[in-house]
């Protein structure tokens, strides 16, 4: 029973981070695993190159407490570079280029897993329906911070046969008032909920989610269908990013086809913010898997917004610049460990 519960925890963490973990220690109910990725990413816009390479490293620890309960702790960081011709110096981050993506601990069992710290909100599993590309995509189903990765958050997830559920609540952050005499909060509390149901063995999955934070809210509906080597999915989202001039509506469509060691994917993304287009693009990519944990890919995003178009923005619309209208080519190599 203990091994089964811990295996569920490991599997859930692996799905959330896309890792192939290596076991560092496993004895007397205590286990520690390390995983991550090294990814070289070259971005080209208007003939100009940018290095978007990154390294992700994570550690997952589990401790069997009894036959029905385990403890879990997880951390993941991302290292990036932005030296722009310098040597060992990041121009934007004062040479500190480590971001913490996850940092949480909690308890789990057959009833699910409860954690506190920096973890995912409930809408990430919904956007995953169409967020399938190696580089591009996922530009129309925006998530509120409380529904994305955020700190100071309690999270729950559970799997019950064909139904998976997630819920999160983020506390408002404590801060001193301007006079420094008493504590108040920043008003960034909120919650998110989601559920995904797999319809028997049909290949059909349905998902729905909702999030609310401060004066913003959103809901999402998603569906996917898998048939052999083919995959199709779609998402619709609607809500308010702000109390005024913040109406938001978006949808994404995605498809994938696996041919031997090559996976072809494509997505279309369209969104409106404040009644004007804020995203409109079509992307295609191809990934070749030399081995299950090593791939190369090429990805191209066709930006369907033209320079001079009205561009939707929260708080007031703008006009699309030449940079806003550029296509993008990305080339990458990714090693998972």
Curated annotation (Swiss-Prot):
It holds the Pfam family Porin_4. GO terms for biological process: monoatomic ion transport. CDD domains: gram_neg_porins. Residues 1-21 form the signal peptide. It is a multi-pass membrane protein. GO terms for cellular component: cell outer membrane; pore complex. It is found in: Cell outer membrane. One of its GO terms (molecular function) is porin activity. Keywords: Cell outer membrane, Ion transport, Membrane, Porin, Signal, Transmembrane, Transmembrane beta strand, Transport. Its main location: membrane. Belongs to the Gram-negative porin family. Forms pores that allow passive diffusion of small molecules across the outer membrane. Homotrimer. This is Outer membrane protein U. It comes from Vibrio parahaemolyticus serotype O3:K6 (strain RIMD 2210633).
């Amino acid at each position: 029973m203990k091994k089964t519960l811990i295996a569920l925890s490991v599997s859930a963490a692996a799905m959330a981070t896309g890792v192939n973990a290596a076991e560092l220690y496993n004895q007397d109910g205590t286990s520690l695993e390390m995983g991550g990725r090294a990814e070289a990413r070259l971005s080209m816009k208007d003939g100009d190159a940018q290095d978007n390479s990154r390294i992700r490293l994570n550690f997952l620890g589990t401790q069997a407490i009894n036959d029905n309960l385990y403890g879990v702790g997880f951390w993941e960081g991302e290292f990036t570079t932005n030296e722009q011709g310098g040597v060992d110096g990041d121009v934007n981050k004062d040479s500190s280029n480590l971001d913490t993506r996850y940092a949480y601990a909690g308890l789990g069992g057959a009833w699910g897993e409860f954690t506190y710290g920096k973890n995912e909100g409930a809408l990430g599993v919904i956007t995953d329906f169409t967020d399938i590309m190696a580089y591009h995509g996922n530009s129309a189903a925006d998530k509120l911070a409380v529904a994305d990765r955020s700190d100071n958050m309690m999270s729950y997830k559970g799997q019950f046969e064909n139904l998976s559920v997630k819920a999160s609540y983020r506390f408002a952050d404590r801060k001193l008032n301007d006079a420094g005499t008493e504590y108040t909060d920043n008003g960034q509390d909120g919650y998110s909920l989601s559920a995904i149901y797999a319809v028997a063995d049909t290949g059909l999955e349905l998902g729905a989610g909702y999030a609310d934070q401060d004066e913003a809210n959103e809901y999402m509906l998603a569906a996917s269908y898998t048939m052999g080597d083919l995959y199709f999915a779609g998402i619709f989202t609607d809500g308010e990013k702000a109390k005024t001039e913040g109406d938001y509506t978006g949808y994404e469509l995605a498809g994938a086809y696996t041919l031997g060691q090559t996976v072809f994917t494509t997505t279309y993304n369209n969104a409106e913010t404040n009644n004007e287009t804020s995203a409109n693009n079509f992307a295609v990519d191809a990934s070749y898997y030399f081995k299950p944990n090593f791939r190369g890919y090429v990805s191209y995003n066709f930006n369907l917004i033209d320079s001079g178009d009205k561009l939707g923005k929260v708080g007031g619309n703008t006009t699309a610049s030449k940079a806003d209208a550029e296509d993008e080519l990305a080339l990458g190599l990714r090693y998972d460990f």
